[in-house]
Design a protein with these regions (language model features):
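Phosphate/nucleotide-binding beta-alpha loop and adjacent structural elements of enzyme active sites
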Residues: 1-185
Length: 186
């Protein structure tokens, strides 16, 4: 697990900045986006992250050796919990910078498979609306973006980037990896 202020945390931050400059459209992967991901890393992998409580909750559903799907993996704190419990994890995250963070944190774990995709009712390709200053609220829903525009609580949120993303279905994931004992979706 990555702890804020640690050498591993600083290394991941540097790698994310390098990835943002070299791999994706700089407008989508701007400095505010990096700050949003770094903030999430601090919250969910930092010294005050609720690891014990999370493990206690998921232990009710996940046994050692279980197959777990993490749909919308964000920065991978649930992946970390599932792995601490001994599960094999298939993690899906469509947001490019969050996926890069996941890859740096969990990419070498042979019991974690990371997919830079989204899950939907139909397979295909869709446009991901990226909020570059708050990348955790990126969405496939243009309707959501339109309704959030100017809505109370969403005044400062702008979806100013777009990325084509492959869509897979739960049925497709099950056909490829098997039936999971637990699916976390958000």
């Amino acid at each position: 697990s990555v702890v804020a202020g640690s050498a591993a945390f600083r290394k991941i931050s540097r790698l994310l900045q390098k990835s943002a400059r070299s791999k994706w459209d700089i407008d989508v992967m701007s400095s505010p986006a990096l700050q949003g991901v770094i903030r999430s890393l601090r919250i969910y992998h930092g010294p005050h992250a609720p690891r014990d409580a999370m493990d206690q909750l998921y232990r009710l559903f996940v046994e050692p050796g279980a197959l777990v799907f993490d749909i919308g993996a964000h920065v991978g704190d649930r992946i970390s919990s599932f792995r601490r419990l001994g599960a094999r994890v298939i993690a899906v995250e469509p947001q490019p910078l969050l996926f890069s963070a996941l890859n740096h944190i969990h990419g070498r774990d042979p019991l974690v498979e990371l997919l830079d995709r989204a899950v939907g009712s139909d397979a295909g390709v869709r446009e991901l609306f990226v909020n570059t200053t708050n990348p955790t609220v990126s969405t496939l829903s243009e309707e959501f973006v339109n309704q959030a525009r100017g809505a109370r609580g969403w005044e400062d949120q702008i979806w100013d980037g777009r990325v084509p993303i492959e869509i897979v279905t739960l049925d497709g994931l099950i056909a490829r990896y098997g039936t999971p004992s637990f699916i976390k979706i958000d």
